[in-house]
A protein has these predicted regions:
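Short, charged/polar "capping" segments at the starts of alpha-helices
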Residues: 6-9, 120-121, 144-149
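Phosphate-binding loop of NTP-binding sites
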Residues: 12, 179, 197, 208-217
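Nucleotide phosphate-binding/pyrophosphate-handling subdomain across enzymes
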Residues: 30-134
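C-terminal helical cap/extension that packs against the catalytic core
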Residues: 125-184
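Short, solvent-exposed loop/turn segments at secondary-structure boundaries
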Residues: 199-202
Length: 217
C-alpha cells in the first residue's frame, strides 16, 4: 500500500480517501475522515487491513467499523465527545516517548493532562513536543515541576504558549483541563509518567479519568 501515490494494484490514498485497485478496477473504500482513531499510523493500519480483507468483507462493513471503533483501552482511547470536545484516555503513556507519540497523532494543538510518579527520567525531549503540539498543559503529581521546567526551557516556548497550570490532585487536573473548552478541542490524558503516586497501575488511572469524563454534563 502507499499513502504517497496511486497504485495499479493495491491500496492507496487519493483525495482524502482510501482506495483499492484490483482486478475489478479502482474504487473508494473509506474516507479518512470516517476513521474515528486519530493519527497517520491508524490510516496506514486501516490500509493494511483493507488490503488483507478486500473482496472478503463488504466495503460498507469496513466503513461502519472504522466509524465506531474507539481503539484499545487506555491507548489513545476515545472516551467521549461532549459538546464538540473529544476526550482521549492515553493512560498507558508512562514515559515521555509514549506521550510524544500520542501528541503527534493529532493535527491540532491539544489540552494535555500530564504528570505522576517520579521515575527520575529526563523530560528534555518532551518539552519541545509539548511546545509544538499543546495549547494548554495541566500538570499534577510529583513530576509537575520537572515537566514544567522542560517546557519552559524548550526552544520556541513563550509565556502562555502553551498555558501551564499545576494542580493539587488528579481530579483537579481533569476539571482544569475541561474548564473553558470550546467545540473542536481535544483533551487527552497522556501522563508521560507512571501512576504509582496515586494509582495501583495505569489501568486504574485510566479508569478514574473515564469515570470523571462520563460524569460530565
Amino acid at each position: 500500500f502507499s499513502r504517497k501515490r496511486e497504485l495499479e494494484r493495491g491500496v492507496y490514498v487519493k483525495d482524502g480517501s482510501i482506495w483499492v485497485s484490483d482486478e475489478r478496477g479502482a474504487r473508494e473504500v473509506l474516507p479518512i475522515g470516517g476513521i474515528l482513531l486519530p493519527g497517520v499510523h491508524n490510516v496506514e493500519n486501516y490500509m493494511a487491513a483493507i488490503g488483507a480483507v478486500s473482496g472478503l468483507v463488504p466495503d460498507d462493513v469496513i466503513r461502519e467499523f472504522a466509524a465506531a471503533f474507539k481503539g484499545v483501552e487506555h491507548r489513545i482511547e476515545l472516551v467521549r465527545t461532549l459538546r464538540g470536545v473529544r476526550y482521549y484516555n492515553d493512560s498507558i503513556a508512562s514515559s515521555p516517548s509514549r506521550t510524544t507519540a500520542g501528541l503527534r497523532c493529532f493535527d491540532q494543538p491539544v489540552i494535555l493532562i500530564a504528570g505522576g510518579y517520579d521515575k527520575h527520567i529526563p523530560f528534555d525531549t518532551l518539552g519541545p513536543e509539548i511546545v509544538s503540539h499543546v495549547k494548554k498543559l495541566v500538570l499534577t503529581g510529583p513530576t509537575a515541576g520537572k515537566i514544567r521546567a522542560a517546557v519552559e526551557g524548550a526552544p520556541g516556548y513563550a509565556p502562555g504558549r502553551p498555558e501551564i497550570v499545576e494542580t493539587d490532585s488528579f481530579e483537579d487536573a481533569v476539571a482544569e483541563a475541561n474548564r473553558e473548552t470550546v467545540p473542536g478541542d481535544v483533551v487527552i490524558l497522556s501522563p508521560a509518567c507512571a501512576s504509582f503516586d496515586r494509582f495501583k497501575n495505569f489501568m486504574e488511572r485510566g479508569n478514574a479519568f473515564k469515570e470523571i469524563i462520563h460524569a460530565l454534563d
